[in-house]
């Protein structure tokens, strides 16, 4: 059985990893990225919010390091920040929305752990999208609630999975 090697937070923050990794209590956790289905959906979500940045007064970023606790740094696949949140190299303020795009290798317990970290950090909207089944879940309260359209109450922000996947399908036609 392999033993994990402890890495200090300072070492992690001062090191570039390719691909980047989550930092959890001194251990580096690989993230499942790089497959086409994951990448194309992540890109489409990022573009969805990028096209509305001025209108909705937001910033959308992919795989942005976010310090979700004193010993935890996570990289949501897509983060949506209010423009009021100061820009930092490693964010220490909660984003408005954290979105995880599932890969076939993702395990439910690991995604649940990320969701718990996001909730404890104060992220109010946590959404999970499965590119293969085209299903989505609002996990903002820790439960997996199936959604086709995600909304941020009291604001114009939304993400429609049917619209998103229709745009992806249009791109796939030669």
Segments (PLM) and residue ranges:
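Gly/Pro/Ser/Thr-rich low-complexity, intrinsically disordered segments predominantly at protein N-termini
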Residues: 1-174
